[in-house]
């Protein structure tokens, strides 16, 4: 989990998207780092549950979200949650549609589903690295599952900051040009410096970027 992921999570909390009981899918603490349940409790969320494939540190419930929906519902013993968070999990699943569909089934009516996945990222096989999901995938998933994709919280998370993904005319990857509006002084000082020193310049596109998507279950 990156600092940008945590920043987006805190923005969602400030916007009132994280209420009531919260479930984190993929909650194992890696190398002792905090998981989302930890951050949520720091923000005042009192009821948090962590789920993962095995009994690791930070995991309260062992569950396989990769099962067919029928098999998953048969094994799932908990009530639905007001908020379900799935951060940096789907890229490690061979069938992200099934996994996220099972996550949706854990969200109560009127609840929120918060998802973060890398879109441009180095390979990281833990245990496998299978896919990179892009904006159109999220838009289509919402339509097929009767979810509302909350446009204000549908964002690129990158070295250039957090910026809303515009669905029209067509989504584009985050670029340093976006900082021209967000940080104009820094943008022009940096660009002038590269020109004066005749450097190779900076990367036009984010070398690492992720997508944060918030859904409302109708």
Language-model features: locations:
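Class I SAM-dependent methyltransferase Rossmann-like catalytic core
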Residues: 1-19
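N-terminal short leaders/motifs
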Residues: 3-6, 84-93, 164-172
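Short alpha-helical segments and helix-capping/turn motifs at coil-helix boundaries
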Residues: 5-11, 34-35, 197-199
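Hydrophobic, Leu/Ile/Phe/Ala-enriched alpha-helical segments that form helix-helix packing faces
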Residues: 12-13, 40, 142
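Conserved SAM-binding loop
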Residues: 20-124, 136, 213-215
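S-adenosyl-L-methionine-dependent methyltransferase catalytic module, highlighting the catalytic core
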Residues: 94-218
């Amino acid at each position: 989990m990156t600092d940008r992921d945590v920043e987006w999570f805190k923005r969602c909390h400030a916007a009132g998207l994280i209420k009531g009981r919260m479930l984190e899918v993929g909650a194992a603490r890696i190398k002792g780092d905090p998981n989302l349940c930890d951050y949520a409790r720091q923000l005042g969320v009192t009821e948090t549950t962590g789920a993962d494939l095995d009994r690791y540190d930070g995991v309260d419930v062992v569950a396989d979200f990769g099962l067919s929906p029928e098999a998953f519902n048969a094994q799932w013993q908990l009530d639905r949650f007001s908020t379900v968070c799935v951060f940096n999990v789907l890229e490690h699943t061979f069938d992200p549609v099934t996994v996220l569909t099972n996550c949706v089934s854990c969200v109560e009516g009127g609840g929120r589903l918060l998802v973060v996945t890398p879109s441009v990222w180095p390979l990281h096989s833990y245990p496998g690295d299978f896919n990179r999901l892009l904006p159109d995938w999220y838009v289509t998933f919402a339509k097929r599952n009767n979810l509302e994709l909350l446009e204000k919280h549908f964002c690129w998370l990158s070295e250039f900051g957090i910026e809303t993904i515009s669905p029209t005319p067509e989504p584009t990857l985050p670029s340093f040009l976006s900082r021209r509006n967000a940080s104009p002084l820094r943008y022009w000082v940096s660009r002038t410096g590269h020109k004066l020193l005749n450097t190779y310049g900076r990367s036009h596109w984010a070398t690492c970027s992720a997508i944060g998507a918030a859904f409302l279950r109708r």
